[in-house]
């Protein structure tokens, strides 16, 4: 899994605008969020089975 910054898109938080990041796993976007959210997702999913991680991709579409 790798975290990739999307330079042309941003996320509006309560007090500021931050760049959008995505987590890519096996050429599939499995999570969209801020950089800390994406790193947290990678941390919690590092020992999860591949099928479970790819199932997350279906939830964001």
Show the residue positions of the predicted features.
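Beta-strand-connecting loop/turn residues
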Residues: 19, 27-28
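A short, charged, amphipathic alpha-helix used as a generic interaction element across diverse proteins
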Residues: 24-25, 31-56
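Short N-terminal "domain-start" leader segments
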Residues: 1-22, 47, 51-61
């Amino acid at each position: 899994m790798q975290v990739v910054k999307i330079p042309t898109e941003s996320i509006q938080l309560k007090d500021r605008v931050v760049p959008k990041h995505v987590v890519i796993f096996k050429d599939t976007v499995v999570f969209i969020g801020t950089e800390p959210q994406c790193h947290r997702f990678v941390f919690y999913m590092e020992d999860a089975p591949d099928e479970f991680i790819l199932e997350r991709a279906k939830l964001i579409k």
